[in-house]
């Protein structure tokens, strides 16, 4: 188990570190300065393609290691968990559609920071990072869980929490007081129970 945990956390950590470093303002600035605007225009698309391809062997890692089943959720509870997974997917999809989807995919240039606006509609009214919240809800409610998948999801969860922390710093730098006020009103990942009027 310790060997599996080490390999899984190392793989996810390496992927996450590379993913975060290449998404940073510094990396983008380097590409812009050294490769020019024409190359930078396709940076986001290349980034998405490369990290999607790198994700495939990472997803296969838990299956490649010795494993054991922890639990399987049976009816009627599996209907509840599946409904919650669908809700998680809906949350993530809504969040994606509220942003500039084509720019997110890299098919249209991103707007400069000064032209971008803070999105606080839809799923963003409940949590500041609905894509992460929806993804976490989806993975942790899988109807079957093995030891390796639990370790993999734990590593992903840790990466998401750390990534959200650094993303918050970037958003504060971009949006200033508007984002600070948003932070005070809306939780990061777990929605608050609605308050009574």
Q: At which residue positions do the language-model features occur?
A:
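Transmembrane alpha-helical segments that form the membrane-embedded catalytic/substrate-channel core
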Residues: 11-25, 57, 61, 85-106, ...
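A generic, lipid-embedded transmembrane alpha helix
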Residues: 46-62
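Membrane-helix interface linkers and caps
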Residues: 21-38, 63-72, 170
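Hydrophobic transmembrane alpha-helices
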Residues: 4-18, 113-197
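Membrane-interface loop-to-helix entry segments
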Residues: 47-49, 78-90, 121-135
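Short, Lys/Arg-enriched, Gly/Pro-containing loop segments at transmembrane-helix junctions
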Residues: 29, 71, 101-109, 172-177
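Helix-coil boundary and interhelical linker segments in multi-pass alpha-helical membrane proteins
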Residues: 1-8, 59-81, 141-151
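Juxtamembrane helix-capping/reentrant segments at transmembrane boundaries
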Residues: 31-50, 74-77, 110-124
């Amino acid at each position: 188990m310790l060997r599996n945990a080490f390999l899984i956390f190392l793989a996810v950590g390496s992927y996450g570190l590379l993913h975060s470093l290449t998404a940073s303002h510094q990396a983008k600035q380097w590409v812009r300065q050294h490769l020019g605007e024409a190359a930078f225009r396709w940076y986001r698309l290349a980034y998405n393609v490369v990290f999607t391809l790198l994700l495939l062997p990472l997803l296969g890692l838990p299956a490649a290691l010795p494993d054991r089943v922890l639990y399987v959720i049976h009816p009627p509870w599996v209907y509840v968990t599946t409904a919650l997974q669908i809700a998680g997917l809906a949350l993530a999809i809504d969040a994606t559609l509220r942003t500039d989807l084509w720019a997110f995919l890299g098919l249209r240039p991103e707007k400069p920071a000064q032209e971008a606006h803070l999105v606080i509609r839809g799923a963003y009214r409940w949590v500041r990072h609905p894509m992460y919240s929806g993804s976490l809800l989806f993975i942790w409610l899988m109807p079957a869980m093995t030891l390796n998948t639990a370790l993999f999801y734990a590593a992903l969860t840790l990466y998401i929490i750390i990534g959200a922390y650094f993303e918050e710093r970037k958003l504060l730098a971009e949006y200033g007081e508007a984002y600070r006020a948003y932070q005070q009103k809306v939780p990061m990942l777990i929605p608050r129970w609605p308050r009574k009027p």
